[in-house]
Amino acid sequence: MATVNKIWLQLGQSWNNGQGGNLHLLQTAYNKRMINVRIMTDNGFECIYPTSNNNQYPTANQNDGVSIEFYFQDIAEHLGEDVYLVKYAQGSTRLQFDNTRTDWNVASVGELYDGTITAINDAISWMNTRGKQYSFEGVVWCQGEGDCIPLSAANEYQQNNIDLMAG
């Protein structure tokens, strides 16, 4: 039986994007090439390698930051298999529709939700081209403070999150 490659979506704002200039803060165990954790980049899935800063996708959002993807090494070791990540994150965003700045709202055209769908389709294409079986295992969503300020964003958060996950 062929291996089913497990893909996780890592989406969100602020700290999920990774904060700039702090790769040196990674514990030694995580500050190395991670052969069992692959992250989607402009070139397809690559092993996470902190010194190459390939953990920031899309590259337009690169800022030399650390976030949760480095710790997926623990999940890969626990499962005894490789983990694939599709990360799409950008700081200073919210789920609430906002026509003055980029947001995650599914009603926004050409913004973060649409970019996420493109990244997912790129991952599917990469797997299919290589004849790999895959399944999407879950979503790791990191909320930012933009979803609690203003109050209207907080009041709409539950429904906006349901809409995002339902796609």
Functional labels for PLM-detected ranges:
Residues 1-167:
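Cell-envelope and extracellular/periplasmic
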